[in-house]
Amino acid sequence: MPHGHSHDHGGCGHEATDVDHALEMGIEYSLYTKIDAENLECLNEETEGSGKTVFKPYESRQDMSKFVQSDADEELLFNIPFTGNIKLKGIIICGANDDSHPNKVKIFKNRPKMTFDDAKVKVDQEFELTRDPRGEIEYSPKVVNFSSVHHLTLYFPSNFGDDKTRIYYIGLRGEFSEAHYHGVTICNYEARANAADHKDKVFDGVGRAIQ
């Protein structure tokens, strides 16, 4: 269910409250720093690499100098790998205040390298979007469906009637946890430990044989 972030504040401290709120949102919407940017891909982007630029700080969400625009038609598809696991709690989609703004997003989890044909499979969740040129509307995924996500796919199949879709900002809010490989670490450690344990014995044996 989408909801806005703008609030009415009465009395003193209006500006301070707005600043505090902006700082809080900036911290909450920092999952973009956990994206494996080198392997992030955007299908049907008009300018190569432009899809990566819409994942930026919350306070830069209204920066119109960086955006992604679709090429052949209105579809855009983002394959977003993370450097660990996330629990997705909120999404903001900021586009132009015209018909190029996407009107729907379909979300898939843990399906790397999806294509437009792959997007026909059962979706994990989808939202009807509202024009949001200021980046004030948050869409809240069902956390139970997105509690352990290492790869996220966002598919925008259409817009409000333009030939091309344009997006300025995609914000992701949630929790992040590092990917741990305890089994590998322990095995490597044990292998090194065993070699060290037997090192002296091996050399002792060789020494005795030579003598």
Curated annotation (Swiss-Prot):
Domain PITH: 20-192
InterPro entries from the UniProt entry: Galactose-bd-like_sf, PITH1-like, PITH_dom, PITH_dom_sf
Annotated SUPFAM superfamilies: Galactose-binding domain-like (SSF49785)
Membrane-spanning ranges: none
A Gene Ontology cellular-component term: nucleus
Top-level taxon of the source organism: Eukaryota
Family membership noted in the UniProt record: Belongs to the PITHD1 family.
The protein's name in its UniProt record: PITH domain-containing protein GA19395
